[in-house]
């Protein structure tokens, strides 16, 4: 199990990797910034939405518009705050005009989400809306049928409690759905109290037995074989010397100060 500092460091590395992503040509050209996600790197509860909107694209943080205000309110009503959860989206870049994500975009971006989940190791994932729910369930059943129903699912290599609810932005368009969303949220504390579901046994790599080396006395080698052995020894010595020099150079390079990029914590990410 990774320590809190190790998780933050791993998320930092993934954050910088995602910032340079250009897998989706259109999104890379039209985005203002990559909205990686924000919150507690050691959260038991993780929210997964659809994609950044205009406000999120400008600020680089998820759920900072009206939908974000509703999310904050709902969290407060169950005794939680943003610094206790982690919030991410299926897409890290804003689709132009807030259109729906394209299947190819989801395919391109899902690796980042699954790696986030693997690093954070939440016990409960609350999917906000159809896109997140369908992706993490590997199923096309819609949110109208699934909202408020918890189930244990495999997400990547881990078993989690998956809890689909309406997306806050969609609920704002239909006021009656806000009440439904509020009612569903009230089940989250109980789900968290259950703890992590039983995990599958870890995969064990089959061991490969190496054949024992057979030592041969120099006198047992034929003249040609002895010469070849001498050449091999000379080459090995030269290679080892070259490698030692390369390692020294690499160590010196590693000692160079890192570029002055902002740490994600300075951006309020995690």
State the predicted function of each range.
Residues 215, 220, 225, 231, ...:
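Asp/Glu-rich intrinsically disordered low-complexity tracts
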Residues 1-219, 245-251, 261-270:
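A polyanion-binding, active-site-adjacent surface
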């Amino acid at each position: 199990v990774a320590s809190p500092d190790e998780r933050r460091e791993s998320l930092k590395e993934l954050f910088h990797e995602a910032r340079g992503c250009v897998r989706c040509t259109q999104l890379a050209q039209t985005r203002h910034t990559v909205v990686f996600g924000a919150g507690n790197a050691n959260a038991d509860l993780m929210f997964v939405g659809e994609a950044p909107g205009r406000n999120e694209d400008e600020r680089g943080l998820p759920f900072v518009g009206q939908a974000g205000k509703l999310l904050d309110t709902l969290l407060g009503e169950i005794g939680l705050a943003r610094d206790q959860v982690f919030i991410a989206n299926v897409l890290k870049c804003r689709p132009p005009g807030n259109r729906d994500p394209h299947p190819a975009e989801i395919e391109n971006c899902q690796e980042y989400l699954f790696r986030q989940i693997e690093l954070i190791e939440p016990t409960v994932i609350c999917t906000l809306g159809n896109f997140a729910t369908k992706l993490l369930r590997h199923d096309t059943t819609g949110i109208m049928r699934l909202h408020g129903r918890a189930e244990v699912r495999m997400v990547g290599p881990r078993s989690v409690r998956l809890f689909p609810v309406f997306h806050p932005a969609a609920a704002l368009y239909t006021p009656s759905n806000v009440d439904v969303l509020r009612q569903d949220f009230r089940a989250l504390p109980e789900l968290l109290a259950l703890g992590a579901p039983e995990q599958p046994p870890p995969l064990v790599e089959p061991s490969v037995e190496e054949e024992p080396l057979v030592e041969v006395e120099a006198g047992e080698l034929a003249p040609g074989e002895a010469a070849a052995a001498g050449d091999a020894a000379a080459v090995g010595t030269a290679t080892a010397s070259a490698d030692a020099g390369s390692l020294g150079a690499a160590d010196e390079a590693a000692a160079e100060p890192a570029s002055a990029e902002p740490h994600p914590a300075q951006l309020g990410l995690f």
